[in-house]
Amino acid sequence: IFVNKAKFVETDEQFILPEPLSDPIIEKLVKRRTAETYEVKAGEYIQIIDPGGRQCSDFLAFDTHKLKDGIESIIDDKATRTFMGSAYPGPGLFSKFYDSDHAAMVEVVRDTVGRHDTFNLACTAKYYEDMGYMGHINCTDNFNKGLKKYDINSRKSWSAINLFFNTAIDANNVATFDEPWSRPGDYVLFKALKD
């Protein structure tokens, strides 16, 4: 079997965003292989859009008040799965992402895809090196660079929420990965529950 993949050519047309759900306070286009940081207050909304379809986006959230006290508290995938009773939250009753102190950080208000990943780390240098791609740009290094301005310690890996990443556990208890389900313009809308 031979598989021919199309070459990705980045053009401005691929990054035309759909109309926002409300007037944006901040609008950022995160180009592939990069990371952006931004601050929100409790009660504000975060809309993460896949403008091109079949892309993935790693998401971290910190509690600003804990950061001021020197505590780097981020979304905890294990706590979230435990409290929600599912692989990842969705709109409705079981809609929150929690930190390791069991505090709700963000709530899923709307999700047009319905398939994400809370089992895997954000991609790392080791992940790519093990596949033979030395020096490959990776999410962990991008996070480390972007978070320096907040005096957040660098890590070898980040336990991020991998939005639009199509991960499942099969009948043999094996993690499977497949093409993302997201189409151009699909999004997840979060409500911040912490600054």
Positions of predicted regions on the chain:
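Acidic, Ser/Thr/Pro
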Residues: I1-D195
